[in-house]
Amino acid sequence: MKTVAVFCGASLPPSEKYVAAARELGRAIADEGHTLVYGGSNLGLMGVVSSAAMNEGGRVVAVIPTLFPEDVIQSQQVSEIIRVRSMSERKERIIAMCDAFVALPGGIGTLDELFEVVVANQLRRFSGNADKPAKPMIMFDVDGFYSSLLSQLDLMQKEGLLHGDCGLLSATTLDETIKLLR
């Protein structure tokens, strides 16, 4: 059993394909017996993925900054709530407690979380050991959402600006994503 962080938007996109992917991922994480950790909002894709995991009988941990209104916290249907002082502390806490990470479609906050993991992997912050593998950071590329970013990262590697194993993986289907988590 792993502890898996899911990074995604607190907004609900108009496209049902992203909502469906979040719902399916939440269910699958629960079905695999993993614990889902997320940023604590009950809104948008965050709310969808956490509700799906809980409804499937999974364990869900919300890491919520104190700047969130109390009604957001009280309305959470999760296994555990961890309160932190800031968005930065939320990110640090999630990264420290998880074995693997999945990025669903999201905005700037999602990219910030994704790249925080990638940088930590490159610096071997998790292990302090260059021989120890990186924690997987999986970009769930729903309907090509991350294809432009993946192309940019490929270019950075070809140009010698991105080095070593940063743990960044991509998957275009739920099945691929779950296999990478195993």
Regions from the PLM with identified roles:
Residues 1-97, 126-134, 139-182:
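A cross-family phosphate/adenosyl-ligand binding-site feature
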Residues 89-126, 138:
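Active-site/ligand-binding-proximal alpha/beta "capping" segment
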